[in-house]
Every structure is written in C-alpha cells, then in structure tokens.
C-alpha cells in the first residue's frame, strides 16, 4: 500500500456532443450515460442508454467512425432490451435497462457489463457477459443477500478490470455499487432535507463489493455473489454532499486505480431543491482499492455548457465511459442533462507532479 496523494492535477477539454436523439420513438426522452470499450479488433463501441416515452430504457449499440479526435457513432441496434421480469414494470414511472458500464476483464477473457434494471422490485444491478462486445448474455441480478450485504435498491455497478485484495485479504474481482435509501426512491425531492440531516456516512455512498476470484473461476455464476462490501466514497467532502456514485470503469495508472465518479449537491431555491450532478477524480490503491489514495476536493467537471444545464434533467454531467488513448490521456464520455452524450479529453499531469504540494482538484 502506498501513501495518500497530496496533489493530483488533470486538464479537461470539452469536445462537444457525440450523440443525441435521432427523432425516433425509442430516443424521444434522450440518449445518455453510455458505456464504452475497445473490443478485440481495436474498434471503439459505445452503449448509450436510449430512453423512449414513459422512461422506458434500452441499451444501444454504436460503433465509432472517423478519427480519434472527431469520432462519430454509427447506430447498430441494441445490446439489451427490457424483456426479463426484473426489467419490466406494469405501473407508470418507467422500466428497462439503464446506465451500463463495460469493463474487459482479462482473467475472465470476457467483457463484463453492469447495468441497472428498473423493474417491479425497483433498481437492481444486473451483470451481462460478452466474448466480442457485440452480443451479450445476461448472467442475472447481483445477489447481495447471500452473504448478508446491503439489500434493496442499488445502482451504479462498475467492475474493476483486474483482481484485487478485499478488506479481508481475499483475492477478488471487485465492482462499485451504490445502495439507495428507500425514502429517496419513494419521496424524491421531498426526502432531501431528511437525507442531508443524516450523518454523511449514512447517506447514499459509493461502495466496492468483492467476489472471491477462485469462486468465479470455478463457476462464472458466482460473479453474482459478492462476499464483502465496504464504503469508499461517502458524501462527506466539500462538494457532493447529497450522494455519490460510481462513474467510469477504473483504469490502472502509476498512482493507483483512476476513475471519475459523480456526486450530487442540492440547494434550496424558493422552497424547492435544485440538484447539480458534478464529477471528480478518485484514485484507489492498486492492491487494496478500499484504500482511497486521492479524492478531488473540488469537481473536475461541472455543468457549464447549455447542453449540460438544460435537458431532461437540468444541471447534470454523469461520466460513465472512458477510452484510454495513451498513457495518462483519456476520452471520457458522459451524459449531459440526461438528454445527450458528450465527450471530454482528460490529460493527467506527469507522475512527478502528483507527489506533493497543496491538494488540487
């Protein structure tokens, strides 16, 4: 385990909108919050959440065309559509397959997708697998109950690409998740004062869950059965005081596991709370990711552009996809105001500059 980082600098350049609704019924309420991954051929695939009328979500399949600096995305259909019982509801309010993240896991030699199913039991994390990134097979819902872990509404599943050590020392595959408070899902904005009055550790916090690697290698179905889970990002910093959630799949850099996460602030405006979704950097220890080496003391990406300020849900940047271009240079794909998909180019400072000094965003 290495020491905490006192400073970590990055530059962020907005590159604009890369995908927006095409006018068809399946996208009338937005395209947003995409996964992305380089498949074995080197092609970049992106998996947008496509939202039809009534908040019915599907996971699209698109392929990048053009140059790295100016990609366009060709629609190829859908990776997953809501047809399982845990994805289908008969009451108003929406249903479907939401907010995917995709990670290639070499030890499994497979692409692993985690997404949120919005069905009769509420939001649940589902895992799907693919050999090529094009054709996906559902493994099923994550079973947190099997080992007495938090059970209920849960979102923001994101897998780490390599085995790590759990808090107990078990070599494991790991994934982010974010259990939700029942009053949050039932009462919406009305629950915000109650949530903010709670101790930060009791608000909606990002956790890492761990699945013993040996059990998964014995039976891939065990990927759904985590044995440990621990809080890694409580909403206890200078920003994002309402809740935090996992964002992009972690990427190995010299300092640790690098990821962008989202966090939410709520401000009372004339008796109604206005929420802002921003993004920050987190770096986890490479061997024991429950140890956080660095966390942004200010957002690195906040809603500023009109496409981020005004949409289906105003004031939202929601990073979910990352494409590694070269060492310490990434394209990050994110949902803008729950309506469109945008891209930023992020470049991390050289390793030497991240060793000491004042904390930076």
Question: Where are the model-predicted features located?
Answer:
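Beta-rich carbohydrate-recognition and catalytic domains
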Residues: 1-29, 33, 37-95, 104-157, ...
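Glycine-rich phosphate-binding loop
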Residues: 101
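Catalytic core of Fe(II)/2-oxoglutarate
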Residues: 244-246
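C-terminal structured domain segments
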Residues: 312-315, 319-322
């Amino acid at each position: 385990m290495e020491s905490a980082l006192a400073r970590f600098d990055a530059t962020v350049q907005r590159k604009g909108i890369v995908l927006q609704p095409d006018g068809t019924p399946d996208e009338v309420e937005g395209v947003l919050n995409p996964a992305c991954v380089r498949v074995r051929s080197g092609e970049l695939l992106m998996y947008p959440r496509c939202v039809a009328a009534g908040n019915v979500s599907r996971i699209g399949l698109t392929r990048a065309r053009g140059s790295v600096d100016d990609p366009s995305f060709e629609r190829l259909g859908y990776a997953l559509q809501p047809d399982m019982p845990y994805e289908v509801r008969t009451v108003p309010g929406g249903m479907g397959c939401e907010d995917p993240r995709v990670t290639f896991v070499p030890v499994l030699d497979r692409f692993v997708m985690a997404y949120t199913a919005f069905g009769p039991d509420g939001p649940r994390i589902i895992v799907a697998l693919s050999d090529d990134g094009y054709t996906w097979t559902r493994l099923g819902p994550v079973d947190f109950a099997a080992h007495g872990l938090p059970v209920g509404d849960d979102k923001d599943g994101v897998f780490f690409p390599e085995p790590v050590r759990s808090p107990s020392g078990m070599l494991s595959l790991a994934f982010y998740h974010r259990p939700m408070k029942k009053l949050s899902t039932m009462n919406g904005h009305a629950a915000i004062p109650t949530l903010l009055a709670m101790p930060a550790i009791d608000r909606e916090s990002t956790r890492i869950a761990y699945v013993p690697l040996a059990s998964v290698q014995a039976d891939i179905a065990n990927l759904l059965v985590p044995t440990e889970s621990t809080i890694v990002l409580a909403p206890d910093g200078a920003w994002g005081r309402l809740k935090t959630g996992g964002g992009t799949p972690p990427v190995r850099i010299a300092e640790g596991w690098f990821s962008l996460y989202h966090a939410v602030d709520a401000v009372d405006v004339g008796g109604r709370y206005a929420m802002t979704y921003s993004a920050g950097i987190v770096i986890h220890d490479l061997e024991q990711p429950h140890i956080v080496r660095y966390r942004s003391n200010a957002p690195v990406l906040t809603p500023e552009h009109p496409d981020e300020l005004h949409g289906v849900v105003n004031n939202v940047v929601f990073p979910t996809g990352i494409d590694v271009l070269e060492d310490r240079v990434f394209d990050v794909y994110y949902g803008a105001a729950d309506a469109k998909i945008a891209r930023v180019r992020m470049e991390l400072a050289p390793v030497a500059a991240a060793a000491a000094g004042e904390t930076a965003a």
